[in-house]
C-alpha cells in the first residue's frame, strides 16, 4: 500500500489486498491433518511454506484485488493545503470539505481482479472528477438519496404503552417472546 500526492492536490492511496487469508491457526490445520487442503501455505510434504497466514502479491502468484482511494480537499472560498507524509495541512481558509472516491480492480465474478481487472486509478479518478462537478449541497443531497434508497427501506414500529416505550428493546423483545 502506498500513499502519494496526485494531480491537483489529491491524496491518493493505492495498494493490493491480500491474495490469501487463512482464519484457522497453523496449529489447528496441522492438528486436524488438513495441511493438504491448504496448498497456499503447505508443500506436498505438509511443511509450511510461510510462517504467516496472510499472503500478498508474488507470495501468492500475484493474486489479490487492487484498490485506490482518492481524496480531494475543496475550498468553497479561498484556501490552500499541503499534502505530506504526515497528513493534509489546510490553511488560509474558514471552510473546507473533502470529496472521497474509491475503486477496485473487480471486473466480474468470473475474472481475476489481479490479471483481468479494471484500472482502479482511472475509475477512482473518473468518479472523483464527476463528484467535483457538483457543489457541496448537491453532493450531500445525492448521497443522502442514494443512502436512503439502500438503507431506509423498512419502517418498523412496535405498538406499545408508555411503560413499554421506556423499556430497552432487548427487554421488550424478551417480554414479547414470553407471551
PLM-predicted stretches and their roles:
Residues 1-179:
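Aromatic-residue-lined binding/catalytic grooves and analogous aromatic/hydrophobic interfacial grooves
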Amino acid at each position: 500500500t502506498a500513499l502519494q500526492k496526485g494531480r491537483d492536490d489529491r491524496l491518493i492511496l493505492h495498494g493490493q489486498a491480500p491474495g490469501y487469508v487463512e482464519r484457522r491457526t497453523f496449529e489447528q490445520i496441522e492438528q486436524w491433518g488438513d495441511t493438504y487442503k491448504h496448498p497456499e501455505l503447505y508443500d506436498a510434504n505438509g511443511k509450511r511454506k510461510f510462517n504467516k497466514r496472510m499472503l500478498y502479491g508474488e507470495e501468492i502468484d500475484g493474486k489479490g484485488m487492487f484498490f485506490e482511494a482518492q481524496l480531494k480537499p475543496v475550498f468553497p472560498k479561498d484556501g490552500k493545503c499541503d499534502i505530506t507524509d504526515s497528513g493534509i495541512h489546510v490553511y488560509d481558509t474558514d471552510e473546507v470539505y473533502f470529496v472521497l472516491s474509491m475503486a477496485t480492480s473487480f471486473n466480474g465474478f468470473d475474472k481475476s481482479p489481479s490479471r483481468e481487472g479494471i484500472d482502479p486509478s482511472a475509475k477512482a479518478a473518473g468518479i472523483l472528477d464527476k463528484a467535483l462537478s457538483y457543489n457541496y449541497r448537491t453532493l450531500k443531497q445525492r448521497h443522502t438519496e442514494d443512502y436512503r434508497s439502500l438503507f431506509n427501506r423498512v419502517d418498523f414500529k412496535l405498538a406499545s404503552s408508555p411503560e413499554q416505550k421506556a423499556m430497552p428493546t432487548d427487554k421488550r423483545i424478551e417480554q414479547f417472546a414470553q407471551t
